[in-house]
């Protein structure tokens, strides 16, 4: 954050409908998380660990994020599973209140982004990182420059957004993304 951000009108207004959440850097659009129908998460919601398997061959942790999506979903769970020494899989299990709603898987990055349908190659300072959306079948990524959501915010320079918009059949399903330092994530 830049010092100027802290002086923005309502920056410290943390109520669910507060001005703070209209600023890009403070809401879920600038973080690696979900949005439903491109709406801001419920600010008074919480994510908490509801399951963990730290001693498993493929360790995992599951978060209950349901209260962050008040009035949008009846349940939202995110599981992080370490598949091997260089690959992690993120599974979002979502049960939408409206079957027509769209779940967007969003991430921001300073890396250069190359998208090929459901695969992404990130490069930054000579380092490489790979992502693949496994489910739902047919989901693809798109990329675009990050931009402010409210007039007066300090400019956002050098950040790219990565997004996959996913319709879930019957409003219930999974969004599964693998991330790895290796091109072959299997």
Regions found by a protein language model. Give the residues of each.
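Conserved small/polar residues in nucleotide/adenosyl-binding loops
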Residues: 1
